[in-house]
Amino acid sequence: MTLEKIKKYLISKINIKFIEIYDDSQFHHYSKKGLTHLRIIIISDDFINQTLINRHRIIFSMLSKMIEKKIYSLTLNTYTLNEWKDKKLKKTSNVKCVKKNNIL
C-alpha cells in the first residue's frame, strides 16, 4: 500500500476537489514497518450537509480493509470547498504581530 494508491482509490470513490495525504509514521514508535500513521486532508462538496461524524464514516468505510490490517492511526480533516476557503481566509486574517523587546 502506498500513499498514491490510497489517494487514487479515494478519488475513484468520491468527487474530490483536493486531497493531501501525509505519512506521519516516522514520528511514532510502533513495531510495524511502513505506513502506520496517516493524516489526510480532503476537500469535497460531497460533504455538503454531512456532519463531521458522517464525513469520517464515509472515509473510514472506504478504507476499512486497509485500516484494520495496516494503519494504526488515521487523522482526517474533511471540508467542503466553501469551508476550506473560509478556513484559509480566517487563518490569514488572524495573523498578529508579536512585539518582543520593543522590536517588531
From Swiss-Prot:
Family matches, as Gene3D superfamilies: BolA-like (3.30.300.90)
InterPro entries: BolA (IPR002634), BolA-like_sf (IPR036065), BolA/IbaG_stress_morph_reg (IPR050961)
Superkingdom classification of source: Bacteria
Similarity field: Belongs to the BolA/IbaG family.
Name of this protein: Uncharacterized protein BU473
Species this protein is from: Buchnera aphidicola subsp. Acyrthosiphon pisum (strain APS)
